[in-house]
Amino acid sequence: MPIFRPKHQKLILQCYPPGKGVDKKPNPSELSYLLYYASTRRVKLEKVVTFLDRKTTSDAKHNRAGNLQVTLTIISSLIEECSENLNVFASFVCSILKSVLQSKDLSLCKHAIQTYGVLCSKLDGGLFSGDKVFVDSFGSLSQNLINIGSENSKKRGPNNLEWQMISLMTCRYISNCLGYNSKFSKKFIEICIPILTETVHANNKQSNLLTILKSNVNIEDENHHLGRIASTKTNQTSRKAQQDLDNDAVKDSDLNEEALRGLKALFSTSLTSQISEATRAIVKNNYATTIDPIWGCTFLEMCTTWIPVQLRFITLSTVLSSLTSLSNKSTKKTSNYPIQLLYANYCLGLVSSDVNMIGLSISDVIQQILFLQANLLLSQSHYFQEEDVKKLSMIYSNCICNLSTHIYYFDQVPDSIREILIKVVSILENSVISGNANSSGVYRFIITLLEDISIIFDLLQTKPSNISRNHVSLEDWDLSLILLSSEIGLNPTKDQKPLFSYEQITDIQFKYLRVFGYFLNNELVTRNENMETGAINSIESFNVGGDHLQPDYNNYISDPGNFIAHFLGYVDKFFSGQSLINIDNASLLQKVLKNMILILGINFINNFVPFFFYWQLPLNPNLVDDNTRIKDTLGYTLIYHSLIKMDKIYELNYVRESEFFNSLLGDINYRKLNKLWVNGLQSKEEDAVLDNHHALGHRDENGTLRFNPTKKNLEDFVIGNAFTLSWINPHRPLILDIVNNYIPKKENNQNVLSDMSDESSIIENSSYHTSARQNGFGLGLGNANDISSIHSGLLFHQSQNVNMKNAFSNGNETSNGSIYTSDRQYNTPRVSDLKDSVLMKKKPGVAFNEHYNSDTTPGSILSKQMVTSDIDSILEGLDIDDDSEIIV
């Protein structure tokens, strides 16, 4: 033994009490002086730890357990006191700890894990980024600590649980260092997750996890509140577990608590990469160990609750990203179905739980899930088993429904519905354009998404959110109205086989009408709104905002391109197919339209008027087929229902006594007597009412067939009441070409009326039948009563709606003067309109627009200066019958 020693060696040796005892502690006064000495200069600190490293090697070799205990205490104190200079001696600390572990003594290893915990708490990113030697040494030390605990815990002995506790504590301590080096982080997350998961799985049933999950989520209900009591209990449990380890009295409950704390340390971080790696490791381990999927879902949800609330969405994004990658790589040889199913279940668990995810992009997530579902039904279904496809598709649908109804922001539900409808239309469009032969997959996809929408609305009713939300509007459905068409899946630009069969088209129409009808009664209006009994007493009461019964609500009257007009245009296309209309679909369509009458009132009626005249039976009996009879019956049923409900809703007490209404009833009875009426569309009660009227006035004294409800009848009806005069325009134009190709041109109808004896009757009705009977060319925009309103809004609606054209439009068809017409030659009035205007000494539209504005649109012919005397001489020379056909 040397007689003379350097000062730092003397100070160190003085800390060791004499004797060969196992449980030693450093002399407190000598230790204090040593710490002071080491903290004064970095050189002194380096000398101290260098000597301690050599002494530890010697003590471990000679099995001096008591001295090793003292050394570990000195090292812990140095780390605490000199943490700002930890980079000077961190590598020596790792070397000392590895020397201690070689003894494989439980008491020394328990002390070593405490020192390791102090070291991990003081490390920073500088050492991990600039000292590769330290990173390797620290990684080796951490691996040794985990292994020594795991290996000894599997051996039969009295201290298995204590050894397992050392591994679990290492996993918790190392979590503080995972954010400093990505490679290091990934390696040890993959090592720690299986150890922690196995311990939790061995000690917790799913019910236990649900209890922890509920406690973490902190659901605010009357049965549970998380407060100081729960927090205090957690701290007490932590201290008890440490005491049990020191006293060799570790229990399974201590291991469980330590594993949960380790998982919490892994996930309670602001590092997105660490959250993603931990999420992947959990799913990968659960798949490899065949853990019950339900237990695994709850386990992942529980871990997610420990993530800062603004970063929880990363877990869901990670699961979806991995699932998308697996879906894209899936082939017939390597389908990856089991792992896809597992990831899909975890995704469902996250979106359907009470775990809030602030910052989650709902639209993006729904798009991802819709992509996965489309890929499943259109591609993977070729090599997956049918039952597997159904199971996975159901999970995707449940994800969409639960995510859409877990409200995070005001417009979430409308955004979700729009995303679904956009996906439906885009898949349909791409399939038609590309000639995709997988019609069954596309059909199945459309039906599935429509069912998803129905479930979303049902969930919103049965489980309403406490968070205020916006409701889905009618306009959100505009893009999807193509599903009403009987020509859905048909590309008019190509001579190819239709995408869908008649049965598939019928099913799509039926499903769409069912979902839309449910939307009308449960989302657009609430359940407690009774449109039939909630009559509105006066026009002044319409000032209440948001009331769909309010005249011109959302410009449903003043805007010719409104949703109601679009919907009715597609209803017309519903009847345009070559096959016989399904009577059940027609009946369901009528119910939907009746609901629209109850909800929209005068707004619907005003838009429906031109369609009523257009849907009447052709006067040529040779052109009457089953579809035209159904359409005619639907038109008469709706106009009857409209008049009755208008009288009741707005308390007019006017309709039933009017000549138009009685003429309408007579016309209906005429159809019944002549077997032109289609039974089964209207209710039995309506049939009973209609059967009480007689057919009168359908033939004049010369025996000429006449239809009573004419435009003149409607004009007289409108003028007879202030409310109808203000809000019903009997001259509203029939706009069939909502977009080119939306409504097909009828054929072989050019001379339907040529044999009729009453030419004035022909002229009187032609404005409502022009598109079908004369191909709709050269008829301008309307007549004197609507020309003003159309001119004032035409340019605005052209620019606003030009992008809403049908996805299947070829753009080559000439417009008949629709609101989307871009050619200025059609934006002109008829001679008959100008004649009425000049002769009555007023501009068009005054009679039917009490809010008429005298200002005209720039460029309008109505703004030009006219010499009335010359105009009079010209107009008087024109025949009445020619007026309506001539365009200025």
From Swiss-Prot:
InterPro entries: EFR3, EFR3_HEAT-like_rpt. GO terms for cellular component: plasma membrane. GO terms for biological process: protein localization to plasma membrane. Belongs to the EFR3 family. This is Protein EFR3. It comes from Debaryomyces hansenii (strain ATCC 36239 / CBS 767 / BCRC 21394 / JCM 1990 / NBRC 0083 / IGC 2968) (Yeast). The lineage of its organism: Eukaryota, Fungi, Dikarya, Ascomycota, Saccharomycotina. The gene is EFR3.
